[in-house]
Structure formats: C-alpha cells, structure tokens
C-alpha cells in the first residue's frame, strides 16, 4: 500500500523521455478517494466482517482497513521508500 502511494506521488511528475511531458496527469481528489476506498475495502477486518460476520485480528495477513489506508497515505504524501520501512516504526503504528 505504501509503495502504491509512492507511485501515485510520482506518476504525474515522471516525464516521458520522448516528449518530456508527464506520463499521467495529477490525480483528482475523486481518484485519490477511490484509491483510499480500495485500500480500505481490502483490509482484513473489512473482508472478515463481510465474509464471516465477525473479525479475528489474530488471523490477519495484510492489515486492517485503517492500516492499509494509513500506509497508502504515508507513501503518497512522502513519495519516499524510506517512509515505507515498516521495520523502523513501533508495532502500534503498523
């Protein structure tokens, strides 16, 4: 999720070598909202609640909706791989 955010950060500023123009235009607020909604929708808590009617955080493999949104936002706002180092943050901030 963090790396996806980094991609969003740089996608509109990476120039095409032939034209010198960015490959993509800057994402709109609606597109960013859609990306955040997608990150939220694939959170283990959201998936478990919909599939089983309850949440068991001991079985999560990809993180909660809140965690996934937070890491996407971290990557998007920072544009830095270093900001995505999950080993460098306290476990409560994963």
Model-derived features with residue positions:
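Pan-zinc metallopeptidase signature
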Residues: 42-94
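Short helix/loop segments within enzyme catalytic domains
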Residues: 2-45
């Amino acid at each position: 999720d963090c790396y996806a955010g980094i991609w969003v950060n740089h996608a509109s500023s990476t120039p095409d070598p032939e034209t010198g123009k960015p490959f993509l235009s800057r994402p709109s607020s609606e597109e960013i909202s859609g990306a955040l909604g997608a990150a939220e929708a694939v959170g283990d808590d959201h998936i478990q609640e919909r599939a089983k009617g309850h949440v068991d955080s001991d079985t999560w493999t990809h993180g909660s909706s809140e965690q996934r949104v937070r890491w996407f936002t971290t990557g998007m706002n920072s544009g830095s791989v270093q900001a995505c180092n999950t080993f460098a943050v306290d476990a409560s901030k994963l």
